[in-house]
Amino acid sequence: MMNAEAKPGDWLGKVRWDANGLVPVIAQDAATNDVLMFAWMNRDALAKTIELKRAVYYSRSRQRLWFKGEESGHVQHVHEVRLDCDEDVVLLKVEQVEGIACHTGRRSCFFQKFEGTVDDGEWVAVDPVLKDPEHIYK
């Protein structure tokens, strides 16, 4: 829900938050423009991200802020934050520490590619596991 009367300096008020106070976020590699992951932010997460220059998301399952890399060490250093034309999606341009953004140990969460036709298609994992998740989360 956007504040239609957003004042100068009220940059958080310009964002169109959903009914749950969240906004979708895409993390993109700042150097290659590869899409790394999708997550959610609330106001606190976006403010912390700006303040720390480090990606902070909102975990819907844990109902709390999620500092990317807090368990895995795969921190995202934020180089740039953008808001889309409808003001309802945030884009983070990041440097991905150790090159792993996905909890599966892959560079990107978008590692499954559709192959085939509408009648016999399937999702195929096309990107390699860079690090076994068993060794990431102990």
Curated annotation (Swiss-Prot):
InterPro entries assigned to the protein according to its UniProt record, in alphabetical order: PRA-CH (IPR026660), PRib_AMP_CycHydrolase_dom (IPR002496), PRib_AMP_CycHydrolase_sf (IPR038019)
Residues binding Mg(2+) are 84, 86, 88
Instruction: Spell out the molecular function terms from Gene Ontology.
Output: magnesium ion binding; phosphoribosyl-AMP cyclohydrolase activity; zinc ion binding
The record's catalysed reaction(s) read: 1-(5-phospho-beta-D-ribosyl)-5'-AMP + H2O = 1-(5-phospho-beta-D-ribosyl)-5-[(5-phospho-beta-D-ribosylamino)methylideneamino]imidazole-4-carboxamide
Entry note: cofactor? Binds 1 Mg(2+) ion per subunit. Binds 1 zinc ion per subunit.
Top-level taxonomic group: Bacteria
Question: What EC number(s) has UniProt assigned to this enzyme?
Answer: 3.5.4.19
Where's it found, cell-wise?
Cytoplasm
Q: Which Pfam family, an example, fits this chain?
A: PRA-CH
Q: Note the SUPFAM superfamilies from the entry.
A: HisI-like (SSF141734)
> GO cellular component terms?
cytoplasm
Pathway given for this chain reads: Amino-acid biosynthesis; L-histidine biosynthesis; L-histidine from 5-phospho-alpha-D-ribose 1-diphosphate: step 3/9
**Subunit record text:** Homodimer.
What is the protein name for this chain? Phosphoribosyl-AMP cyclohydrolase
